[in-house]
């Protein structure tokens, strides 16, 4: 099938496949409609007005195979969305921090200002609900100010919003993250407006033994607008520092925003059901409210979300470990590959590489693999890392690496930019990198290429000819002006200048609750390229690594 063809979808009614006898009845009707459409001028035929979406189609097939029972709660494909850019700034839906390309001193942080302003404006437009999720600690500094200023504007406009704020808490590390304290802090900052704002504030850990908690970063307002990506609301990492983390969110409106709300309802349903267990959930509320597990559903009712544009989007998340064991409706039976170098002495059960049930409740993992697999010419990956902290986690996702190896072997160009390994913490995950050297990525790709091709020479040709790999820089200088290495926190995959993922899900093994959007729009992908991928490579190519055994290349 060529890239400009869209495969036919199986006929459905209310989300279910049609029975054969019902399908048989539709055949004469469909033939008649086909005849009519064929007779129409091309300008009025439906297909002429609907651009092909080969990437989303491939991903949707994977999702229906892996997690059919989670459609509408953890993943959903929608049309009629709009990338939420302000007038006069068509690429303004892309929210980068700090946005000071080319300046190691990062004096003008235009991207950060745009992000905080967008957060405030979205919240200020609320009439009913505001839904926020992040990794602990709670939003502070300028991020908290954006939330408070937006809520004050809502109340000043005569509304009484319901607000949920959910953070994922790592055991022990986040013992000082106390929802009741944050609730009280918000009430104090809201002042007189606090009486009109109903709060649910919670921290949650779904599995201590499998290291699972919320990692999604969402701001959903009235189920109509959403901001999501990799940015945590932490002032010390993003705002009040001379070496801010480079990160990206995206903003949209339309049915995909409602999809994000449904995902948050799924997380809050678990949170509310476990609110009496302090080993799992700490909850604080205001104004006598109870826990609100279905706030988004209650707001939306049975009315479908209104379309606001023409952009097709797949919203896709994951449930990590501890919320749901498996999707009982899934007939998914993968052939799970193995690799001896994914284990590091004593480790945890390998959910990423060796657990079919985990796959069925974490559809985002196969969605990202399918996005990469759908590439025909090139793949751009911008991530904190591709390898995890091993132990306790497995070193890498075998199927993701195998998919990348398959692309390299097929002549597809692959560019990977990751956070400078100099950001590695004392135990790997203590900083914004988990590797000591870029060789850990290129050596793994070579190993998987040899396993795929069975030939060292073929593997070398594919690796040397088609891979670009670099550590992140945002200016010509090797470090920030204060001498600190550049930290990258993107969770971004783009293919063929046509489709891309922006969200909170890393490509390395991590069993968290995550969420993101996969967008297929050549126009938006070109904006992403111009505003982020091109400047990123302009500076990062100076830190490009040549894989072992490959001839040195000129940067470019």
Swiss-Prot record:
Q: Does the keyword Repeat apply?
A: yes
Q: What do we know about this protein's activity with respect to temperature? A: Optimum temperature is 60 degrees Celsius in both directions.
What is the protein's given name?
Phospholipase D
> Which Gene Ontology CC terms are recorded?
extracellular region
Q: How does activity depend on pH?
A: Optimum pH is 5.5 in both directions.
Please give the SUPFAM superfamilies that the UniProt record associates with this protein: Phospholipase D/nuclease
Q: What does the UniProt record say this protein does?
A: A reversible phospholipase active on phosphatidylcholine (PC) and phosphatidylethanolamine. Lysophosphatidylcholine and egg sphingomyelin are hydrolyzed about 50 times and 100 times more slowly than PC, respectively. During the transphosphatidylation reaction straight-chain hydroxy compounds, such as triethyleneglycol and triethyleneglycol monomethyl ether, were phosphatidylated in good yield, as were monosaccharides. Disaccharides and sugar alcohol reacted slowly, while N-acetyl-D-galactosamine, D-galactosamine and D-galacturonic acid were not phosphatidylated.
Q: Where in the cell is it found?
A: Secreted
Q: How is its activity regulated?
A: Inhibited by mercaptoethanol and dithiothreitol.
User: SMART domains of this UniProt entry?
Assistant: PLDc
- What catalytic activity is recorded? a 1,2-diacyl-sn-glycero-3-phosphocholine + H2O = a 1,2-diacyl-sn-glycero-3-phosphate + choline + H(+)
**Does the record bear Ion transport in its keywords?**
no
- GO biological process terms on file: cardiolipin biosynthetic process; lipid catabolic process
Biotech relevance, as the record puts it, is: May be useful in the production of emulsifiers.
Boundaries of every PLD phosphodiesterase domain copy: 210-237, 484-511
E.C. numbers? 3.1.4.4
UniProt superkingdom: Bacteria
Fetch the InterPro entries from UniProt: PLD-like_dom, PLipase_D/transphosphatidylase
* Pfam families in UniProt: PLDc_2 (PF13091)
Q: How is it modified after translation?
A: Probably has at least 1 disulfide bond.
Give the principal location in a single coarse category: secreted
Q: Which family does it belong to?
A: Belongs to the phospholipase D family.
A GO molecular function held by the record: phospholipase D activity
Name the segments for region: Disordered: 326-360
Q: Where is the signal peptide?
A: 1-47
- Keywords attached to this entry: Disulfide bond, Hydrolase, Lipid degradation, Lipid metabolism, Repeat, Secreted, Signal
